[in-house]
Amino acid sequence: MKLNNIILSAILLTSASVADDITVKQEGVKYIKMLGGTLKNKLQSEMKSDKTGVGAVTFCTNEATKITAEVNSKLPAYAKVRRTAIKLRNFEKNGADDLDMKIMKEYIASIEAKTFTPKDIKVVEDGDVTRVYKPLLAKQVCLICHGSKISKAIQEEITKGYPHDKAVNFEENSLRGVIVAEIKKH
């Protein structure tokens, strides 16, 4: 009986440790969901409370960077998460590097070739850092602020917060950008 208990305990301990060992991809996706989910929920709340969309622009201008910093403060020291795009609204905070641009161009090519799936998570080794990329597609609601027919009130708010804005003229289901988790080897 004691032998059975010892064997059962060993199996349970092994199972628990295997369950705790998540892959870098899974870890990155977890952090991406933390940022993406928080931003999406708060933005949707703004859109519900102000149907004009002006409040959403104000929210993005004043809160998106703060929320990104808050999410990053909850991550382990070896990890961070951020957003970027080819056509940016906030150049100073969300600029893309060469690797980001390469990945986004690959996503665009797969969209054009009709081989794209929104669940296409890319994992790229970059020195001692692994980057996990999740694509962000422009949904119909996004076009209120990122499309080609932006209301005057929204455009004024965008221009006030982002005088060098390039994040416009998207079409539904085009690549809006990516969320990137960067995880250092540890």
Please provide the spans of the model-predicted regions:
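The canonical Cys-X-X-Cys-His
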Residues: 139-149
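Hydrophobic h-region of N-terminal signal peptides that target proteins for export
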Residues: 10-19
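Sec-dependent signal peptide recognition
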Residues: 2-9
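Extracytoplasmic c-type cytochrome modules immediately beyond a signal peptide or single-pass transmembrane anchor
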Residues: 19-139, 153-186
